[in-house]
Amino acid sequence: MKGDPKVIDYLNKALRHELTAINQYWLHYRLLDNWGIKDLAKKWRAESIE
């Protein structure tokens, strides 16, 4: 499929931002879980999956 390179670039940037956000939520979930803050960790995990 061929597309406008500028549009594809914008979509790739948006995807990169979303994946970065997911990784940050997951990292914070793991840290909170490790520190014993289980209730907040569950919320961050759910947010990372959303």
Swiss-Prot record:
Q: What does this protein do?
A: Iron-storage protein, whose ferroxidase center binds Fe(2+), oxidizes it using dioxygen to Fe(3+), and participates in the subsequent Fe(3+) oxide mineral core formation within the central cavity of the BFR protein shell. May act as one of the electron carriers in the reverse electron-transport system from cytochrome c-552 to NADP(+).
Q: Does the keyword Heme apply?
A: yes
List, for all copies, the residue spans of the domain called Ferritin-like diiron.
1-50
Identify the Gene3D superfamilies for this entry. 1.20.1260.10
The record's remark on the cofactor is: Binds 1 heme b (iron(II)-protoporphyrin IX) group per dimer.
Which residues are listed for Fe cation binding in this entry? Answer: 18
Kindly list the cofactors needed.
heme b
Q: Which domain of life, per UniProt?
A: Bacteria
Q: Which GO terms describe its biological process?
A: intracellular iron ion homeostasis; iron ion transport
How it assembles, according to the record, is: Homooligomer of 24 subunits, arranged as 12 dimers, that are packed together to form an approximately spherical molecule with a central cavity, in which large amounts of iron can be deposited.
> Could you tell me which SUPFAM superfamilies the record lists for this protein?
Ferritin-like
- The EC code for this enzyme is 1.16.3.1
Q: Which reaction does it catalyse?
A: 4 Fe(2+) + O2 + 4 H(+) = 4 Fe(3+) + 2 H2O; Fe(2+)(in) = Fe(2+)(out)
- A Pfam family that the UniProt record links to this protein: Ferritin
**Keyword vocabulary terms for this entry:** Heme, Iron, Iron storage, Metal-binding, Oxidoreductase
Its recorded name reads Bacterioferritin
Q: Which family does it belong to?
A: Belongs to the bacterioferritin family.
Q: Which GO terms describe its molecular function?
A: ferric iron binding; ferroxidase activity
